[in-house]
Amino acid sequence: LQILDLGQIPLLAKDRTEDDPLVIGGGCCTYNPEPMADFFDLFYMGEGEISFYELFDLYKKMRAEGKTRHEFLHEASKVPGIYVPSLYEVTYKEDGTIASFEPIYEDVPKTIQKQIVLNMTEAVYPEKPVVPFIKATQDRVVLEIQRGCIRGCRFCQAGMVYRPVREKNVEHLKELAYKMLKSTGHEEISLSS
């Protein structure tokens, strides 16, 4: 929220105009997006790589056609894994839990299915990551080797959220590592999972 404030972007999605950027949420926090729903225009439910290009192409098309922000958000809600809070009526019980969750338009999905990348080797991954102009603490390439965890500890949200375990092909990882080192000038690789 501080980033929005510093960027002079209205904090509440309902207060944003056609001139304001879209505020999109994703990652682990989207498994319970309601506490932050008033601040976001839309959320990716699950892993964003699945619907990123479809959403981006829709955005470009609708901008070219002169469509409004609301019209875009309405159409975006039909992209698998996209949750647009402004298109749902949510009521709460006295204890703060959700009593009902209903779309306000008939063509908006009643439920949003989280999206999962099943083949990590085919998943989009930056071969030429942005390199900061200043000295960074993590002055190395970050290479994602897998998602998921075989343990599934009950206290660990990430271990449960990113199931099932999915690994990238070793040859593909070698190719990515070479390209990323060459394009960034870094000399070290941090393996991420």
For each of these PLM feature ranges, what is it?
Residues 118-193:
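Radical SAM [4Fe-4S] cluster-binding motif and immediate context
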Residues 65-66, 111-115, 166-167:
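Short, exposed beta-strand "edge-strand" segments with a Pro/Gly-rich flavor and a Y/T-containing core
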Residues 1-103:
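Glycine-rich beta-alpha loop elements in corrinoid/cobalamin-binding modules
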Residues 7-12, 18, 105-112, 119-121, ...:
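Generic detector of short, locally flexible boundary/turn motifs and exposed helical patches
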Residues 15-17, 74-76, 115, 135, ...:
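A generic structural signal for short, solvent-exposed coil/turn residues
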Residues 84-89, 93-140:
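Ferredoxin-type iron-sulfur electron-transfer modules and their immediate structural context
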Residues 18, 25, 34-37, 64, ...:
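Generic, low-specificity signal for short hydrophobic/alpha-helical stretches with a mild N-terminal bias
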